[in-house]
């Protein structure tokens, strides 16, 4: 058994901070939480009495198997095998940053499934993963390889499907090969070469077919959706979360609030993209889309927060280097959240979106996934950018 002594503990469910708490852990699961716990003989003590302890953090929008280096080389010289042999490094780096659970929303060749399985079996270190396999998108859309010669073929990596029957089949294929969640491309994107970032890329009927098929297999759907109409189609079709949500309007906000749909807004990575992507050879068309949409996304995120739309923490990690996931907390606070709300988005809210009752809070029956910081993150949320203590399943990952 393990007893963790916490100087302060953030109860993300109650929204309070409790002083002088202890956490008793057995077989990687929290057994008891409270003051003055008596540890059985032989219990290992982890003294965090000078720190504030929080649940392990959750990022629900990551691409843990990739990280951009060069726009064209990434497409023409990097194979799925290259990606597979480096993905475990990104996973370890993210875990050490305090993110003990991730949702992976799209990966080539089901590499995310293999990574999840290896982590679950204890073969490599990494966060707990919920994975999507291939992102499902339309021909010529954000999930397709656009902007290249028609003589180049990318079918090997493709999640492209058109029409109700084809998208249903691809949902089934993803489930067959191990997907925990379904990722749907509802609108055009920023980091691809379509013309309009807001344009819908599936009809309502196709979106509804994806959501219905996923539900039949017990899977939730995450919708990549920047554009106003695409967001509303996706919400009406029954998605669990809208990813990005950059151009959401008042009607879309109302629909999401009424249906309890989560917004997953990656409000940090605009800074990184504009600072670094030109150096990596990204086309001007892509950079111009980012310049136009970054501020709009943050302003609309602020409106959604104010309106009470459910928020879950998702950063699009893999667009920027893995392990920097904590950078987004400060941006969320800058654009309308309290520090507590930002922390809840990365703990209890994210767990609710995932449908994973074993993560997201410090309570009996949950995995002993903990992080600790020096100071009070409810006063200075930037403390979560460099976390000195990480525990996953009762095992210390980082202590510095």
Please tell me what each predicted stretch does:
Residues 69-72, 192-194, 231-237, 267-282, ...:
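Histidine/acidic-residue-rich catalytic or RNA/ligand-binding cores of hydrolases
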């Amino acid at each position: 058994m393990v007893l963790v002594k916490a100087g302060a503990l953030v109860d993300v469910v109650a929204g309070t901070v409790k002083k002088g708490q202890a956490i008793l852990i057995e077989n990687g699961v929290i057994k008891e939480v409270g003051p003055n716990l008596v540890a059985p003989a032989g219990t290992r003590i982890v003294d965090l009495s000078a720190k504030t302890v929080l649940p392990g953090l959750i990022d629900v929008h990551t691409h843990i198997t990739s990280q951009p280096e060069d726009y064209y080389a990434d497409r023409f010289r990097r194979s799925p095998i290259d990606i597979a042999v480096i993905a475990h490094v990104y996973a370890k780096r993210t875990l050490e940053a305090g993110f003990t659970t991730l949702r992976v929303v799209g990966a080539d060749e089901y590499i995310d499934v293999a990574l999840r399985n290896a982590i679950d079996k204890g073969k490599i270190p990494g966060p707990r993963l919920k994975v999507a396999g291939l992102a499902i998108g339309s021909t010529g859309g954000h999930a397709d390889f656009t902007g290249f010669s028609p003589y180049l073929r990318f079918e090997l990596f493709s999640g492209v499907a058109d029409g109700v029957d084809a998208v249903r089949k691809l949902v089934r294929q993803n489930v067959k090969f191990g997907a925990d969640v379904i990722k749907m491309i509802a609108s055009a994107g920023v980091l691809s070469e379509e013309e309009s970032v807001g344009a819908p890329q599936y009809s309502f009927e196709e979106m509804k077919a994806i959501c219905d098929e996923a539900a039949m297999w017990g899977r939730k759907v995450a919708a990549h959706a920047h554009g106003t109409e695409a967001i509303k189609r996706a919400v009406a079709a029954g998605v669990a979360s809208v990813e990005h949500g950059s151009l959401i309007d008042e009607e879309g906000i109302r629909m999401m609030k009424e249906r309890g749909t989560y917004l997953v807004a990656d409000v940090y990575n605009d800074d990184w993209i504009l600072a670094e992507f030109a150096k990596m050879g990204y086309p001007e068309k892509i950079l111009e889309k980012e310049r136009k949409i970054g501020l709009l996304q943050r302003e609309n995120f602020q409106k959604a927060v104010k309106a009470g739309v459910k928020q879950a923490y998702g950063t699009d990690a893999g667009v920027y280097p893995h392990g920097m996931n904590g950078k987004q907390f400060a941006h969320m606070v800058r654009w309308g959240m309290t520090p507590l709300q930002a922390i809840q988005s990365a703990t209890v809210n994210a767990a609710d979106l995932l449908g994973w009752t074993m993560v997201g809070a410090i309570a009996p029956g949950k995995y002993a996934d903990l992080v600790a910081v020096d100071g009070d993150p409810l006063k200075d949320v930037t403390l979560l950018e460099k976390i000195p203590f990480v525990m996953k399943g009762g095992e210390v990952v980082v202590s510095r």
